[in-house]
């Protein structure tokens, strides 16, 4: 199973949930029905639990993220960056099989690929504060 690729799909689906009114389960089921996407090497349990966990803990995740923002409000963060922050914050809080520092590094890699260069240091700074507050 490819966790990096699975995390990329989790990002895409978390973003989809953010811009639509779909629930996590609807989003995941729609993804599973898409025959154009090869799912052979994906960690589907990771993707599904991530979506459900983000949905279930959205208020807690957003509150924790917002508490680490300096001169920013949550609604000013791009939906892609917010999705990245939610995934990593969820992993830091709840994913026992993903070390916090690994989650932050993976979030930075997602940011490099799906956002802009200015966002990399922003994402890193917020997640570093989240991690230090939790540990």
From Swiss-Prot:
Instruction: List the keywords (alphabetical).
Output: RNA-binding, Transcription, Transcription antitermination, Transcription regulation
In alphabetical order, the GO MF annotations are: RNA binding
PANTHER family named among the record's database cross-references = ANTITERMINATION NUSB DOMAIN-CONTAINING PROTEIN, N UTILIZATION SUBSTANCE PROTEIN B-RELATED
Gene Ontology CC, one term: cytosol
Q: What is the lineage of its organism?
A: Bacteria, Bacillati, Bacillota, Clostridia, Eubacteriales
Q: Which domain of life is it from?
A: Bacteria
What does the entry give for GO biological process?
DNA-templated transcription termination; transcription antitermination
This chain belongs to the protein called Transcription antitermination protein NusB
Q: What family does this belong to? A: Belongs to the NusB family.
HAMAP family the UniProt entry points to: NusB (MF_00073)
Q: Which InterPro entries match?
A: NusB-like_sf, NusB_fam, NusB_RsmB_TIM44
Function in brief = Involved in transcription antitermination. Required for transcription of ribosomal RNA (rRNA) genes. Binds specifically to the boxA antiterminator sequence of the ribosomal RNA (rrn) operons.
